[in-house]
C-alpha cells in the first residue's frame, strides 16, 4: 500500500460539558487500488439499476440481502470464538470494545447502546468507539477514519487493559483508525478480532481472529451500508447476545436482566416471570416487587421456593446463572 502524502487536520472533540478540545492529528492518505475489493466491484445483476421499476429495485435488493446469512454461515466458527472471548472478558471484569468508522462505527455504537437495557449491564461494559467521536454518528468528520493516532487516544481514554476484547469493524477491511486500534490493543495484550467484508483484509491480518464475510458486490456499487452493513449488524448481534447469554443474562431464551424503564418493559418483565414459572400475573407482580424489581431474583424465588434474600444469595453463588441458582442446595 503506497502512501502518497500526509495532511494535518484539526479535530474538535465535544465534551459532555459542551466544551471543544482541539487536536491536530496527522493522518495518512493512501493511494489505494479499490478495484480488487469485492465491496467495490460492480454487481452484474444491477447494471441497469437506474432503469428498474420500484418493484424491481426492491426485489433485487431483497434477493441480494438473502445472500448475507448464507455468507455469514461460513464464518460461524470464528464468530463463536469471538463470543467465547467476550464472555471470558466479562467474567474477568473486562469489557468489549467495538471500533469502526462511518457505518461500521455507527453499527458498533448501536449494538453497544442496546446492551444496558437488554441485559442490565453498565454502559461501560460494551463500548462502541467511532472515528471522530459522537459527532461522527450523525455526520462525517473529515480525516478521522484515516488516523491511527485517534484510535490509540480513544482506547487510552478508556484505560484499555489485557482483560478487554477489541473488535475492529470495517467493510473494506483497511480503515487506518481500525488498524491503529487493533495494533494498540495487541500491544496491551488484548484479544483482538476483525470484522470485514473482503477476504484477506488488512484488519483481518492485523487481528488475532479474522471474521471475513464475502457478501458479494453491493446493489449500489461501493455502498457498504447495504449488504456489508447488514452482515456486520448480524455478526455484532451474535457476539453481544451470545456472550451475554454465556454469562448468565438469559434463562432459557428469556431476558432475565431486562431493565424496566417504561410501561411496556414493566409488562414484559411480568410476562417473563410468568413464562419462566407458570404463575398467575398477580403472583409474578408480587414476586418482582419482593425482589426489588429484579426479574432474575423473582424467577429464582418462585422456582426454588425461597425468599428474595436467599434467591439473591443463590444467584451470587451461581454467578448470575438462574438455572444453576435454582439447583443449589438451600443456603
Positions of the model-derived regions?
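Short, amphipathic alpha-helical interaction segments embedded in low-complexity terminal/linker regions
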Residues: 243-331
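Short, positively charged and aromatic/hydrophobic N-terminal segments
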Residues: 3, 7-13, 17, 33
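Glycine-centered, small-residue-biased loops immediately flanking beta-strands
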Residues: 94
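Cofactor-/ligand-binding subdomain signature composed of acidic, glycine-rich
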Residues: 27-71, 75
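Gly-rich Lys/Arg/Thr-decorated short loops/hinges at beta-loop-alpha junctions or inter-strand turns
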Residues: 60-68, 128-139, 251, 292
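A short, well-structured juxtamembrane/interface segment
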Residues: 74-89
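Glycine-rich phosphate-binding loops that contact phosphosugars or nucleotide phosphates
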Residues: 97-235, 241-247
